């Protein structure tokens, strides 16, 4: 019973998105010129090649930042209700922090925190 309802809702959502995209494509104005394909940054014309390679280090630092940012998102609510959770809550957050510290130690050992 609920599976049928789920399928109907998903198909309806897909159909509505397809109709909206189709209508937008049908009624949108089309103008092709040389400036439309140019890349820009903050309204300033590009100098040199527009496709540049970035070092992987930026992405690695971004992923590590996100990992520890998510840790903070989990720690703040835990700190608010720490007294109500008891021993189980303490051990669960300690387990979480141990896994996080092990991940940090692994990244440090592999040299992910060193800028090359």
Curated annotation (Swiss-Prot):
* GO annotation, cellular component aspect: NADH dehydrogenase complex; plasma membrane
| InterPro entries for the chain | NAD(P)H_OxRDtase_bac/plastid, NADH_UbQ/plastoQ_OxRdtase_su3, NDAH_ubi_oxred_su3_sf
What Gene3D superfamilies does the record tag this protein with? NADH:ubiquinone/plastoquinone oxidoreductase, chain 3 (1.20.58.1610)
Q: Which UniProt keywords apply?
A: Cell inner membrane, Cell membrane, Membrane, NAD, Quinone, Translocase, Transmembrane, Transmembrane helix, Transport
Q: Which reaction does it catalyse?
A: a quinone + NADH + 5 H(+)(in) = a quinol + NAD(+) + 4 H(+)(out)
Top-rank EC class of the record's enzyme: translocase
Per the UniProt record, one Pfam family is Oxidored_q4
Its EC number(s): 7.1.1.-
Any idea where this protein resides? Answer: Cell inner membrane
Report TM segments.
3-23, 61-81, 85-105
**Sequence similarity:** Belongs to the complex I subunit 3 family.
Function of the molecule: NDH-1 shuttles electrons from NADH, via FMN and iron-sulfur (Fe-S) centers, to quinones in the respiratory chain. The immediate electron acceptor for the enzyme in this species is believed to be a menaquinone. Couples the redox reaction to proton translocation (for every two electrons transferred, four hydrogen ions are translocated across the cytoplasmic membrane), and thus conserves the redox energy in a proton gradient.
Quaternary context: NDH-1 is composed of 14 different subunits. Subunits NuoA, H, J, K, L, M, N constitute the membrane sector of the complex.
Q: What is this protein called?
A: NADH-quinone oxidoreductase subunit A
Q: Which organism is it from?
A: Phocaeicola vulgatus (strain ATCC 8482 / DSM 1447 / JCM 5826 / CCUG 4940 / NBRC 14291 / NCTC 11154)
What is the taxonomic lineage of the source species?
Bacteria, Pseudomonadati, Bacteroidota, Bacteroidia, Bacteroidales
């Amino acid at each position: 019973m609920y599976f049928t309802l789920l399928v109907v809702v998903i198909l309806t959502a897909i159909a509505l998105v397809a109709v909206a995209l189709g209508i937008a494509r049908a009624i949108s104005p089309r103008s092709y010129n040389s400036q439309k394909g140019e890349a820009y940054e903050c309204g300033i014309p590009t100098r040199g090649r527009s496709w540049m390679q970035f070092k992987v280090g930026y992405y690695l630092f971004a992923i590590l930042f996100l990992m520890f940012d998510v840790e903070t998102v989990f720690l703040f609510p835990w700190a608010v209700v720490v007294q109500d959770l008891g021993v189980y809550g303490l051990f669960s957050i300690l387990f979480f922090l141990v896994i996080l510290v092990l991940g940090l130690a692994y990244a440090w050992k592999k040299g992910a925190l060193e800028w090359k």
